């Protein structure tokens, strides 16, 4: 079988059987299984990335335009995760794929798209977990200012300053980061340089 370049993975080629060839090592890459799906490790932009082989086949020989598109999923028509035939693969949105999976497994389709982002959520929910407002929590000692923190830490260090201001050291460091956008290490370095 003829190897064809993988558009979104320069230096790699694939054939219709799902063998992935590296031009860096001049070898066919070893496969391993991730959640029942055959996968390979590719070096993309200097980082090692696990890529499912059925996504590569669908990208090169099918309808998956972008190999790493998180909005599209590749479905095995016959539900056999090891069947990598390009005729057995189809590209679906997350919602379409969930509905097909529910139908294939005989489950009721109790999930609906979130009105804000479109990802699947339970029918009785108002929004999905991603769009649900996160609790803000209670701010400990809201009157604690950046000047108070800076003055005390430069004078006595984080531990003693926290004790003096009656908060934990981690609370003091988090408050400093929240107020300045800087790491607490910046203030520690300033103290050392005095």
Swiss-Prot record:
It comes from the Viruses. Keywords: DNA-binding, Early protein, Endonuclease, Hydrolase, Nuclease. Induction: Expressed in the early phase of the viral replicative cycle. It is an enzyme of class 3 (hydrolase). GO terms for molecular function: DNA binding; endonuclease activity. Its EC number is 3.1.21.-. InterPro entries: His-Me_finger_sf, HNH_nuc. Endonuclease that cleaves only one strand of asymmetric DNA substrates thereby introducing interruptions into the template or coding strand. This is H-N-H endonuclease F-TflI. The lineage of its organism: Viruses, Duplodnaviria, Heunggongvirae, Uroviricota, Caudoviricetes.
